[in-house]
């Protein structure tokens, strides 16, 4: 870590006021404070000097999100393999979901942080760290089969309209992740609603769900007759 810190100390003057990269200071500061605790303190009032800043707080929130993210990845895989009738292990289901989610997470962070850096540099203020959490929440609330370009457009709308126009992190009245989902719902409703079931790479699967099976279930008077659908009471209760 000392080597990395020496590198930052060496290039630091180029990003300070009067340096040739002065305008890029917000981007430089974002990377430096991600690696090391900021050296500055608040200007007034009672405060305690410690290593917990907004970046570290956001990292804590990300760690809290990981169990839900990992479960979602596994669930994507197990629903896929169950629908096509194949045997699978826990790791196979998890890795299937992992490779489906990874591009979405990369696009979300790439587009969102790019906008955050652009706004910070143009305004001359520090990069808002709030998107570290938002960038993970947006893929988690989106359909797994949404095209990446739609995801990117939703991220642009959420960050600019749902956040930056209000002043950035802490001043927005809209939740950026839900704003992205709402935008996609109204702009491309066919991707967000309907009775189509997602099964990766397969369209010929029949009988998983849909309007007809659900209508048949709703019209049954004897719960025992539901056994012909291979739905147990526990399946209907817990999913």
PLM region spans:
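Hydrophobic alpha-helical transmembrane segments and adjacent interfacial helices
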Residues: 136-146, 162
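Long hydrophobic alpha-helical segments that form multi-pass transmembrane helix bundles
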Residues: 170-239
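N-terminal signal-anchor module of multipass membrane proteins
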Residues: 1-105, 109
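Lipid-exposed faces of alpha-helical membrane segments in multi-pass integral membrane proteins
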Residues: 67, 71-74, 111, 115, ...
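Short, amphipathic, aromatic/basic-enriched membrane-interface segments that mark the entry/exit
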Residues: 52-53, 99-101, 117-127, 143-146
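Alpha-helical transmembrane segments within multi-pass membrane transporters and channels
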Residues: 149-166, 170-175
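Central hydrophobic cores of alpha-helical transmembrane segments in multi-pass inner-membrane proteins
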Residues: 104-118, 135, 155-163
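Cytoplasmic-side transmembrane-helix entry/capping segments in multi-pass membrane proteins
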Residues: 125-134, 152-153, 171-181
